[in-house]
Amino acid sequence: MQVSSYLRRALRRPPFPAGDANHRRLSSAPAPKPEAPAEAMPPPPMPTRPWGEALAAAQRAFCLPLAGRVLAAAGTGNAAVSAPAVHVSLALAAGGARGATRRQVLQALGCGGGGRGGAADAANVASRVVKRVLRDRSTSGGPRLAFAGGVWADASRSLSPEFVGLAGNVYGSAAKKADFKNKPEDAPDQINSWVKDSTKGTVTTLLPAGTIDQNTGLVLGSALYFRGRWLDRDDLRRTTEQKFYCLDGTSVEVPFVEYDRTRLFAVHDNFKVIKLPYKQGKNERKFSMYIFLPDDHDGLFELTQKIFSEPMFLEQHLPTEKCHVGISVPNFKISFQIDVKDFLKDMGLELPFLREAEFSDMIKEDDSSGPLFLSDVLHKAVLEVDQKGIEETSVSMGLGKPLPAQHFKADHPFFFMIREEVSGTVIFMGHVLDPSSRT
């Protein structure tokens, strides 16, 4: 099968404009006789709504529910998920799907009724998120970002060159093959090696050993790494060892960064929220971390229940007023890896995982190797918040400096999100239960 016509036409670009003189000089062969005019093809569908509106719909319909399920199932460890990265991978899968399979994927992604316009919305959101939000521009002084996404089929399949081009050109991802049937034990190493190369070593594994077997169909994968420097890091007071109180009543000694600054800050019933902006590079993007800190040491899960059960809760409780705040935040690193297949099924995405799935636009028309379906949807999130990221600087407090009006000490479990402010894309959601854990 071929890539759907509306995507194929979007990819097709003639090497020269019709009648270009340079084109005529490249060949001495006589010009072919004009053919009878073909029936005019309808133009490819345009997105049904502006990308910002489509992105907001996707975050409400897909990203928030997925993040809620992942974090609720994370157990007693730190966890983070980049739902937009998973969204990009599934949008890529939709680009290679047909019929009911495509409709179901698009509906799960929050892209309308799953028709051609919905497919254009999904492609538009995914393409802009990858190219505008997740692309690394750390050389200009902004945060370090590394995204890798792709789909892998068995080596026996004949991938459509048009779909391979679609994956790279539109979704910033890859469509590749690995030998699932004959060398399933080697396939994870092959895929992990590609992820490591694509992220320049910031993400070293995506597939754990034993993930692949001889019956594996398609594997979708996405990984995102983030590390930034706080804005105004020269205002840093000090880094000290302090206690962090865990949910089980124990405590751990970890490094805390302490400083005071005027920041967007809000006090709500039973929790506080602070916005910590990252240093901006020489582009329009602006990243910030928002920390939601419950008043009670064991209040995190009650808070996250509200966050994920009310679609507008986060937006309605973001801080809007600035305040001079004494800030104390622990260093932490999260490296969290998970197969989100079961969460997607719980969200109604079932057909793509059945042998009846139709991903025929991923392969050539002469591929007769049998059913093509999703086996796994793997995701990994890696982010670092530590003294290296903020470039610790020794600064004296100074006499006569005003005391902060509020204090924000994140010394017990909290929820956080990292948002790109210009587009409104929430690239990470997560929670910290024990900052001494480095996985």
UniProtKB/Swiss-Prot annotation:
Protein's name in the database: Probable non-inhibitory serpin-Z9
Site (Reactive bond): L403, P404
Organism the protein comes from: Oryza sativa subsp. japonica (Rice)
Domain comment, as recorded: The reactive center loop (RCL) extends out from the body of the protein and directs binding to the target protease. The protease cleaves the serpin at the reactive site within the RCL, establishing a covalent linkage between the carboxyl group of the serpin reactive site and the serine hydroxyl of the protease. The resulting inactive serpin-protease complex is highly stable.
Stretches for region RCL: 389-413
Bias type Pro residues, positions: 31-44
Record InterPro entries: Serpin_CS, Serpin_dom, Serpin_fam, Serpin_sf, Serpin_sf_1, Serpin_sf_2
Pfam family for this entry, one: Serpin
Region Disordered, residue ranges: 12-44
Superkingdom field: Eukaryota
PANTHER family from the UniProt entry: NON-INHIBITORY SERPIN-Z9-RELATED, SERINE PROTEASE INHIBITOR, SERPIN
One GO cellular component term noted in the UniProt record for this chain: extracellular space
Any GO MF annotation of the entry: serine-type endopeptidase inhibitor activity
Lineage, top ranks: Eukaryota, Viridiplantae, Streptophyta, Embryophyta, Tracheophyta
SMART domains found in the cross-reference section: SERPIN
Family: Belongs to the serpin family.
